[in-house]
């Protein structure tokens, strides 16, 4: 008897099984190929805009993705560095082979975790409660909780031109039996589609005509736990399609599964195939292609931006029309893949299914796309399954606390009909949710769960104390426009002042940096750079942050008004049938969650709020 069974060893499965095992739960990970645990099926990169936030948040609570990325990374960059800190994003190119080896070894070394190379075929469900799993090897395993992290494997169908192949990934069997079984449970399900790009033999690329894209000179680690971070970095390159490339693609639209009706699943809006781009943006004469090394040996390159399901011979023809790729040899062809997913409105915020007790879902099965989105969900599913076994309150992150909270709330409340990916624009309180303050926002959760060490948490507390002291000093210290103070400002290269201001207003200037901050008071000279960066950020955006915090307080009032789990919305007089139907379907846990449901009017919220408050007074 296991406490937790995790089905699938991708990024969601890695985090789910690791979290459960590290929280002391006897855990079993079932995966089709142990060699492919933590495999990066698509591009060789972790992070990016908003995705980097997810990785930092995972790391802040004790997740694995940040540490593995730092160990396997071969190029590190901060995207949007010229823009505000709220929308900057960390991104790393990874050695794909090294990444999965590290992930696999981390799991194999964990106490409480067993791994078995088997494919789950059927779930054991009794009275709408999952009890265990049967596998293709006819083994039966019982567990208190089961977490589905099946990725693209549920009835996975690969498309290349007119050819179709049942697979979860090239060379790996699709999960047909489990996919068909889930259809019998009365869950709302659908089909989605994603795709991948060709990989090219490095020897066949003329790099001399490509634009070089180097990593940052002073790269920053993803994990706050990474020590002596000094990675070997490789360049990426930029190529461009041209009108010849576009003509080749247009002339073969009739062979594209995307346009022939062969593919039924909805693809990712923000990561379209090259044929979709040429069709949708027919006026553009060129599209960027990012040429990314797959490993530190750089023997193969991933052609990012060239995702396609066109026939093999067309892929060769269109790639060779690109400058620098005239003699290109494709080692692995691009393809599209369709797969089953469960509509995420079927889930609670804990990622447990509403209809099947003790059954959790994470990753692409919930309609998301991306390694980082999957890892975040897997981590939270592993935590909440473990907390439920211990009969403890679940960990549900609010939208103002974490991008992970935004991700899960969007899925559960709004649902999705297309592959969902995270953007900074999805977060209402993004100034509060910066990458660098993730440890300050979420570190205590990781520590309380036993996923962060005492040493890690002490480090976080020191930064929090420095931030509090530094900000209080800047807000309380007045600067008068006398000769001495103005001479000091001039020595820093700053403009003089003509009226009394506090130091926060001076530090908020765009030209004010860490070196200048250190000269304001000896206290700052003793602080580490992490603390100083956060003091600087908080000072620069102080008024905007204060406004967002005021908005959060309003939201918290609605979030704290909980709706009983089995609440009958029909019992509330004054609600329309449409509103009752939507509320009964979504089963929002709070008034705030109800406010996020499309079609729920302010008047309906007022009625519901008054009714629940009255019921609580009676109780």
Swiss-Prot record:
Any single biological process term in GO: tRNA methylation
SMART domains tied to this protein: GIDA_assoc_3 (SM01228)
One Pfam family cited in the UniProt record for this chain: GIDA
Bilayer-crossing regions: none
Residues engaged in binding FAD: 8-13
Residue runs in coiled coils: none
Main location: cytoplasm
Any single Gene Ontology cellular-component annotation: cytosol
Record's subcellular location: Cytoplasm
Cofactor: FAD
InterPro entries reported for this sequence: FAD/NAD-bd_sf (IPR036188), GIDA_C_N (IPR049312), MnmG (IPR004416), MnmG-rel (IPR002218), MnmG-rel_CS (IPR020595), MnmG_C (IPR026904), MnmG_C_subdom (IPR047001), MnmG_C_subdom_sf (IPR044920)
Keyword set, alphabetical order: Cytoplasm, FAD, Flavoprotein, NAD, tRNA processing
Binding annotation for NAD(+): 267-281
Oligomer and partners: Homodimer. Heterotetramer of two MnmE and two MnmG subunits.
Similarity annotation: Belongs to the MnmG family.
Function recorded in the entry: NAD-binding protein involved in the addition of a carboxymethylaminomethyl (cmnm) group at the wobble position (U34) of certain tRNAs, forming tRNA-cmnm(5)s(2)U34.
Protein name (database record): tRNA uridine 5-carboxymethylaminomethyl modification enzyme MnmG
Gene source species: Campylobacter jejuni subsp. jejuni serotype O:6 (strain 81116 / NCTC 11828)
Taxon lineage: Bacteria, Pseudomonadati, Campylobacterota, Epsilonproteobacteria, Campylobacterales
